[in-house]
């Protein structure tokens, strides 16, 4: 299946490369190059980026911070990643806008749904930073929410693995990779696709989710073009 308007969910950890913290410029440039190719192909691209390479709210809470405060710090981390990715894309002459749910007018536009859609219609990449703007919500939930708001055809979750497995493939060499799954199976079996709120949002709005390996050469383009890579989660999908 080919798509027109897509939402790409990037984890903050994906921007680290082989480092244990921060941003690897070479990785960001490679991701930007792939996104640029997709834009040149005529697709409308929105992006939600996490902040776990800099700060993760739930870990901060576990270390003694108030959870809401820790989540706000994590939201700010996502903006750092969003601006970094924007810079890499604009160096490739890809017009890009960052919109944030928390006002940061010196560095980003406020999130306005109609403006975001207009940017996409004009061929600009839109990167959504600072999550939903509310604590206790993950960036996976942000991806599902923004996808519904902008009428995206699909959510692509780019990860370090090539799909969804029935157990951890690092611990179990016999782990089975699924090709397709339905929302209810994912929710009932608590598979680590996205958190349950994000899955439920996609289910309620009939938005398919494609989980694929970000680091396979050309995988972003292949996924957007509708090739069968990774695992697809959808309402009509059989478990296979």
Swiss-Prot record:
Enzyme class: transferase
GO cellular component labels: cytoplasm
Keyword terms, alphabetized: ATP-binding, Cytoplasm, Kinase, Nucleotide-binding, Pyrimidine biosynthesis, Transferase
Binding site for UMP: 51, 71, 132-139
CDD domains according to UniProt: AAK_UMPK-PyrH-Ec
Subunit structure: Homohexamer.
NCBIfam families: pyrH_bact
Its biological purpose: Catalyzes the reversible phosphorylation of UMP to UDP.
Recorded family membership: Belongs to the UMP kinase family.
EC number, UniProt record: 2.7.4.22
Lineage: Bacteria, Bacillati, Cyanobacteriota, Cyanophyceae, Synechococcales
Regulation: Inhibited by UTP.
A matching Pfam family: AA_kinase
Top-level taxon of the source organism: Bacteria
InterPro entries: AceGlu_kinase-like_sf (IPR036393), Asp/Glu/Uridylate_kinase (IPR001048), Uridylate_kinase (IPR011817), Uridylate_kinase_bac (IPR015963)
Entry's transmembrane regions: none
Predominant location: cytoplasm
Encoding gene (name): pyrH
The protein's annotated pathway: Pyrimidine metabolism; CTP biosynthesis via de novo pathway; UDP from UMP (UMPK route): step 1/1
Protein known as: Uridylate kinase
Coiled coil region boundaries: none
Biological process, per Gene Ontology: 'de novo' CTP biosynthetic process; UDP biosynthetic process
Catalytic activity entry: UMP + ATP = UDP + ADP
Residues noted as binding ATP in the record, renumbered to the chain: 9-12, 52, 56, 159, 165, 168
Gene Ontology molecular function, alphabetical: ATP binding; UMP kinase activity
Localization of this protein: Cytoplasm
């Amino acid at each position: 299946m080919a798509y027109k308007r897509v939402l790409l969910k990037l984890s903050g950890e994906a921007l680290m490369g082989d480092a244990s913290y921060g941003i690897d410029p070479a990785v960001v440039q490679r991701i930007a190059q792939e996104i640029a190719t997709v834009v040149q192909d005529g697709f409308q691209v929105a992006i939600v980026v996490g902040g776990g390479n800099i700060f993760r709210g739930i870990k901060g809470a576990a270390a003694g911070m108030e959870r809401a405060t820790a989540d706000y710090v994590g939201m700010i981390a996502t903006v750092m990643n969003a601006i970094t990715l924007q810079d890499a894309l604009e160096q490739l002459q890809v017009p890009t806008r960052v919109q944030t749910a928390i006002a940061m007018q010196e560095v980003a536009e406020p999130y306005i749904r109609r403006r975001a859609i207009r940017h996409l219609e004009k061929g600009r990449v839109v990167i959504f930073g600072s999550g939903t703007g509310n604590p206790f919500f993950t960036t996976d939930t942000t991806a599902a929410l923004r996808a519904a708001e902008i009428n995206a055809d699909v959510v692509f979750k780019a990860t370090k693995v090539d799909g969804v497995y029935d157990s951890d493939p690092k611990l179990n060499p016999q782990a089975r990779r699924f090709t397709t799954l339905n929302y209810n199976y994912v929710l009932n079996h608590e598979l680590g696709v996205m958190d349950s709120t994000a899955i439920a949002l996609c289910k309620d709005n009939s938005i398919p989710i494609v989980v694929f390996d970000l680091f396979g050469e050309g995988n972003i383009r292949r996924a957007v073009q509708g090739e069968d890579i990774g695992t697809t989660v959808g309402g009509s999908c059989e478990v296979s």
